[in-house]
Amino acid sequence: MPPKANPLKLNKLQLKTLSILQELTSDPGITERDEVTGGTRIIGIPAPHGNHFHVGARVVMSSDATGLNNEGVWLALVRKGLAAAGVFPFSIVVTPAGLGYDTGIRDQILHGTDH
């Protein structure tokens, strides 16, 4: 039997935010290992310019990233064990469970870049 899609019942904004956070964890310039959780601490959330912002080699539309500035979304991810508390809105830890969670929408919101 295949695994259930979205078993923690994240809403669309939470799924988008987690997808972006997962991608941000691959950037060694803004991350560090969190010894307490075994996860990855993001210590630099990129700022949008115009209608998008860059996440490594990918581009995210600003409209898909509103959860990065929504404390309620961060708290929901913490409650569900996908993140650990950081300093909103500057840093957050993506736990091993969060790193491995299949949001199913990664390719819908993370686009290739042409500049």
Model-derived features with residue positions:
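Short, amphipathic alpha-helical interface elements at domain boundaries
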Residues: 2-65
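Short, amphipathic alpha-helical interaction segments positioned at domain boundaries
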Residues: 3-5, 79, 97-115
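Short, solvent-exposed secondary-structure capping/transition elements
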Residues: 30, 85-89
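A generic structural signal for ordered alpha-helices
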Residues: 51, 55, 61, 72, ...
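Short amphipathic alpha-helical interaction segments
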Residues: 62-81, 88
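Minor-groove-contacting beta-hairpin "wing" of winged helix-turn-helix DNA-binding domains
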Residues: 90-95
